[in-house]
Amino acid sequence: MALRRSGELLAVPAEVVKTVDDAVSRAVEAFQQLQAVPPAAINTFFSRFADLIGDENAFGPVLAANRDDVTKAKSLGRATGRLELTEKMRSDMIGGLRMWAELPLDRLERTDVVDHGAWSVESWRSPLGVVAFVFEGRPNVFADATGVLKTGNSVVFRIGSDALRTARAIRDRLLVPALRDAGLPDGSVQLVDSPERSAGWALFDDPRLALAVARGSGPAVG
């Protein structure tokens, strides 16, 4: 593929391009649907997601997947400090999600007014669209990434390959059930389900994104 801005040629497998395209397409559709969802339903999602993370039965498969990720990463000689899903990380995820649930933000809200007498200038908060994240291999990124739903955005993210099993388990066991329990479209939060680093390039090159955020360093987030 050729980058739209620079024209630089990158080797991105066709199946990776399709995986990214499908994820963004679902997020675009979900963004449109989210505009009709009441704020209370979005808050319910955050609360339900937090509840499921705190539920031992629901969280068990996630811990098992994380142990597999950690074991594989160690066998490859990689650092696992941020990869291992500790009780503190779990608690921080719950706290972050509950914070989003309680935060007094609306998707469409006037934030400032400058009065010039005969006329005025207003600033409004409104949804952006699809927000993309590329993260290193940290399982707690779900609490960070899903925060954009608070103001009516949808999200697509790619996580480092070391944490992909954990991410899949969180998605399947916790995230999707929380979305459905709250009545939100499944496409609201999309994981780019590919271990290929090139998926990050394909994601950030998609013109349908409203905002792209990279967290970390090196080629894993490049």
What are these regions (language model features)?
Residues 95, 99-182, 210, 221:
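Conserved small-residue-rich beta-alpha loop and adjacent elements
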Residues 39, 160-162, 194, 217-218:
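Short, ordered loop/turn segments at secondary-structure junctions
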Residues 1-122:
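N-terminal Rossmann-like NAD(P)+-binding subdomain of aldehyde/semialdehyde dehydrogenases
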Residues 183-187:
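Short helix-terminating capping/connector loops at secondary-structure junctions
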Residues 36, 55, 180-181, 205:
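Secondary-structure boundary motif
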Residues 19, 141-144, 198-199:
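Well-ordered alpha-helical segments embedded in enzymatic catalytic cores
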Residues 130, 190-222:
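Conserved NAD(P)+-binding/catalytic subdomain of aldehyde/semialdehyde dehydrogenases
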